[in-house]
Amino acid sequence: MAEFFATNLWPLIIVIGQSVLLLVLLLISIAYILLADRKIWAAVQLRRGPNVVGPWGLLQSFADLLKFVVKEPTVPSGANKGVFLLAPLVTCVLALAAWAVIPVNAGWVIADINVGVLYILAVSSLSVYGIIMAGWSSNSKYPFLAALRSAAQMVSYEVSIGFVVICVLLCVGSLNLTAIVEAQNSQWGMLGWYWLPLFPMFVVFYVSALAETNRPPFDLVEAESELVAGFMVEYSSTPYLLFMLGEYVAIVTMCAMGTILFLGGWLPPVPYAPFTWVPGIVWFALKVLFMFFLFAMAKAIVPRYRYDQLMRLGWKVFLPLSLAMVVIVAAVLQFAGLAPK
């Protein structure tokens, strides 16, 4: 044991430091992304949105954080207390764990593993367990029904996302996220990114990501008219905050995945000066914000789907379309001699 720490202590300290720094930056960015979500929703409805706490309401999210932390957590009398309190922690930790392999710039990644895409798909699939645990342990019919809805919804749309990812992997020949970004680097700039040749898959990914993260118009899990607040109806205080945090981290993760798969990651839209002078992490952040803007606009202007419409879209439209695109992309790459070696 002593020999292990003698040879691996500094690498371990560096990884822990990187993880803490990423966690802090991610949580701060989530605070302002949540504020932007509320501001966009307010602008569409011709309102001002949060504008009291701090200049232009910039400290509103931190005030909400303080409110949640100081409130007393309550556990229903018939609930399974251990599972009830563990569920939000599982959801939040799994959402944060995905960022261990996401590169925000060339070489700026905690773990540059060769199966990064597979890792993210696996972690995002596990997040449904936190929701199932919350629904079952609450000992209430509304959270349990919402948890069952969420499980069916997430499983349905993960299939489509998987086929979308396969289309990109066929073009790249690698599961490494850094390799996917570098494969889009060309003299054509943004016209060489995969959003253009794989545009149908970009649309499928965007809509499936909305459903995967339970965002409007697919927020059937939190349908206020039917299920009150969904699987979170019995939660308050810090456990509720962890659920909200996990939800928004998952949304930003999907935005980052869309950026890496289709929008060139940290690559500039025009591969010439002065665009190349801008740091890659700035381009990455701007593209993630663009993806989140699409998420926010869908929440603001699209009415909620019925549950049968949601399932029909996933199984009868997206699944055949994405499967057909996998076959078409593979055939085109093979016959055109463009398949990666």
From Swiss-Prot:
One of its GO terms (molecular function) is quinone binding. The gene is nuoH2. It holds the Pfam family NADHdh. It comes from Rhodopseudomonas palustris (strain BisB5). Belongs to the complex I subunit 1 family. It is an enzyme of class 7 (translocase). InterPro entries: NADH_UbQ_OxRdtase_su1/FPO (IPR001694), NADH_UbQ_OxRdtase_su1_CS (IPR018086). Its EC number is 7.1.1.-. This is NADH-quinone oxidoreductase subunit H 2. One of its GO terms (biological process) is aerobic respiration. It catalyses: a quinone + NADH + 5 H(+)(in) = a quinol + NAD(+) + 4 H(+)(out). Keywords: Cell inner membrane, Cell membrane, Membrane, NAD, Quinone, Translocase, Transmembrane, Transmembrane helix, Ubiquinone. It is found in: Cell inner membrane. It is a multi-pass membrane protein. The keyword Translocase applies. PROSITE patterns: COMPLEX1_ND1_2. NDH-1 is composed of 14 different subunits. Subunits NuoA, H, J, K, L, M, N constitute the membrane sector of the complex.
